[in-house]
Amino acid sequence: MAELKPFIFVPLYIYPTETSWQPLLAAAAKHPQLFFKVVVNPKNGPGPEALPDANYVTGLRALASLANVCVLGYIHCSWGERDQAELENDIMVYAGWTVRSPGIRIDGIFIDESPANAALVGYVAATARFVRKTFANPATVVYNPGVVVHVAFYQAADFIVIFENRASEWPSDFVQSNLSKLGPELRRKSIVIAHSCASQGLQLKLGRRLFQEYRIPGQLVTTQAGYASWCPYWESYWDEMRRWYNRSITLEGTSAGV
């Protein structure tokens, strides 16, 4: 019987000052049974330097000190148009951080703007293979096409973001019809990012439903329109989700409640 712990997915696109990452650091430290997958993105990727600036190094070391935080480096593939060599260079820079600066831990790569065209399965899979070949430890690879994609994409990915949109779009016939094509084993490798949620109540309701009914382990539901600032209800959101973190999501033999 397949089991998977749910997690909160955090695009941490906030510059690290002394306090700007504290909402995440405090949540992870207070409740070590909660799991977070966190994307860091210094310069639309790692940037040209061998290491990010001192503030990033300090922030990354703080993240690395938390065993319940998985740190992913951001790269983008421009929907399949970016040259493979450029992607590989970004990946090598992230892998180099852990060598050049003790205390930094990069656990994998987040591939943004991943293509949804099934003809490009091999393109993204080659990137995933390069990640795993480059990192010394087993690496997590997350694709972000933002929509449901062909099953073949799941073969090389650990997780795929199947929805990144306004929360109001989640109940739409288009989304739900595509979601119904994903069986339990694919849902267990899926992530939902729902932004611009209209209220705190709707935020918490959707968060619960993603875990309880849809059996999707990874999520971020926020009232913010983007990821450059914290949701004002961040603490109540993760506190509500916390009650699910002590329960494994059992996916084998369950219905998804679409």
Functional labels for PLM-detected ranges:
Residues M1-V258:
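Glycan-processing catalytic domains of CAZymes
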